[in-house]
């Protein structure tokens, strides 16, 4: 009887852990991405929504920081946690996005900054990628191969001096000659490859 009780307890724990994952989204990045130090990735997706729900929470995770635009409007400035992944709790941001959506076509754009190194206050996952999920009746926006993604080459490393070794951030140079003007706006016509599921 004691073994039977332990077996039921174990099955319950496994089922509970599986149910908690419940994600329809996938971690995505681009074939060109090597998850190197100071990597910047641009993601975008156009979605059609017949009727915007009253509330829609997006669950967003990235290592390390991200910026979110919806229909050209900045919704999140420097989201994400400066600590990296943890095996003991969640590390995604819940973001209410319904006020930024409209009936019809919507453009979601996310810029991800992957530190690519650990510091005293950050644990590097080793993965430059995005996880995005917003699901409600009649609406499903999930990161998958239908998203577009590219390494944003305008963001570059600099020469020394570098930040203190305790910090995971890097110095940043932005080369405006390589800017992808309007990539985060509706109607962008530039070429971006489809994302890869990792």
Regions found by a protein language model. Name each.
Residues 179-198:
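Catalytic cores of secreted or luminal carbohydrate-active enzymes
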């Amino acid at each position: 009887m004691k073994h039977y009780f332990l077996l039921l307890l174990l099955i319950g724990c496994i089922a509970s852990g599986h149910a908690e994952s419940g994600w329809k989204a996938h971690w995505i990045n681009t074939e060109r991405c090597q998850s190197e130090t100071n990597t910047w990735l641009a993601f975008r997706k156009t979605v059609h929504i017949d009727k915007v729900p009253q509330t829609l929470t997006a669950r967003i995770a990235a290592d390390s920081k991200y910026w979110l635009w919806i229909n050209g409007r900045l919704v999140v400035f420097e989201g994400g946690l400066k600590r990296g992944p943890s095996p003991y709790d969640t590390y995604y941001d819940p973001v209410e996005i319904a006020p930024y959506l409209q009936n019809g076509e919507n453009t979601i754009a996310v810029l991800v900054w992957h530190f690519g190194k650990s510091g005293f206050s950050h644990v590097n996952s080793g993965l430059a990628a995005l996880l995005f999920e917003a699901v409600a009746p009649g609406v499903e926006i999930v990161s998958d191969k239908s998203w577009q993604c590219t390494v944003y080459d305008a963001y570059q490393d600099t020469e020394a001096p570098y930040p203190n070794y305790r910090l995971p951030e890097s110095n940043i140079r932005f080369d405006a000659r390589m800017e992808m003007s309007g990539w985060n706006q509706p109607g962008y016509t530039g070429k971006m490859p489809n994302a890869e599921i990792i």
